[in-house]
Amino acid sequence: MNHASKYLYYNRPATKWNEALPLGNGRLGAMLFGGIDVARIDFNLDTLWSGEGRNKSNSSDKKDWNAIRTAILEEDYKAAEKSLQENILGDWSEAYLPLATLTLERREERLREDIEGYSRGLDLTQALYKETYIEEGISYEQEAFCSMEDKVFVLKLKASKTALNLNLKLKSPLKGIVEGEKQHTLILTGHAPIYVAPNYYHCEDPVVYKEGKGIAYAMGLRVQTTGLVHIEEDTIHIVDADEIVLISTATSDFEQEIGYNPASVVAEQLENISHMPYETLRERHIEAYQHYFNAMQLELGEAKTDRTTDERLRLFEEEGCKDTA
């Protein structure tokens, strides 16, 4: 791998969220954790929020600012706070919500622990995620991007032999439903909750759903592979493949016309995009991304970029700017 200054690089999978590597196109985002036995990708969508479109401002006609000021000056803070909460402040702002988690799990147990040359990284010049390692003489490679041009997330897995045997499971932390469709496709659909309390505010019902209310959303995942495919509920099973390409997209009915069907939209998008070769999608993504990325360049001097990103961060915390970053 290229460990240039514009490359985030790790020699182990992420163990926590802030070690995962981000991809996004301004609408659909993904956090890639990497992994050998189980890999995880968390997705989010820009328009997936709680709420149902109601006016959350305070309609009280008792907005007596002078009384509040007087209470504060008299150090009667409880009275001032009570009046503010009842007559001035509106309800909580809406909560931004996670969309889904995709797990890629090996179908068989590893008999040996010797993994050679594990590496995962993010090439900032091309917005490409890459992961490589060797196991029992077989080379495994992953590459992923989130295309602004075609509005899809794409992940390619490749092995030097027909050694890719995976279960791909799509789940949502919301009350979504995942169904297998034709053409090696999973479709996740659901409605966002109408109310989500802040995590620091304790109440009896911190998350509230209401049937038919809340933002409707959908996410689609389609597989193209040289292996055998079987779909069972929320899982795609793949056997004896040497190459797998995953294409995913998502949408919601936020600020859309009445009758907008997110599930139909993502199904149509996947159908249209699946006819494009992986290399074409990759080239279109890089060209669109670099139009913005290459508009300027910031040089901060030489850096010891042979170290992994987590090692550079650790040294920076310990030593400051002593040529470690």
Regions found by a protein language model. Name each.
Residues 1-325:
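Aromatic-residue-lined binding/catalytic grooves and analogous aromatic/hydrophobic interfacial grooves
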